[in-house]
Amino acid sequence: AILFYFTLLLAVGATAQPHYYELRPDIPPVYNYNSDSLYKKLTGLKDIELSEKVQMDYAASLAYYHERMLHSGYIYFEWSELEDYVNSLVKKIATSIQSEKEFKVYLVRSEDVNASAQDNGIIYIYIGLLAEIKDEAALISVLAHEISHAIHSDTKKNFIAYSRQSKR
């Protein structure tokens, strides 16, 4: 509990002043995420719900979004204690529901109270959300919610709906 409140105190301090970000060409190796391999993996899957064009667009959009997040300066690369803690909670949740999907949490430098998940197991947790969380149980609830989005392929479902709607 002390670690949790100390972490939240640091998170609140992290959001107290505006940040100015610049593109980061020097992403630490542990964060390297090969967007090309993600794109190939996603386009190689045969999905009866998606036409080949929509599937390629979907794969490209996921890969592009993550690449943009990594290079934007919005991802914390130097806060390993908090990242390890949140990833350990995600691992416990995934193990408890017997999920075979691998998850990775990225901490986002933003005051927004938000979190999001991609179907490929990437979860973005915004520091503004962590600053508002009252205890570990609340954080676990948010993480479980995001894991459910990834498991149920909600990103893909939204992309399909958007693709169909934009054709009208």
Where are these regions (language model features)?
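Peri-catalytic and regulatory segments of divalent metal-dependent proteins
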Residues: P18-R168
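Sec/Tat signal peptide C-region and signal peptidase I cleavage site
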Residues: V12-A16
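Bacterial N-terminal signal peptides
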Residues: I2-A11
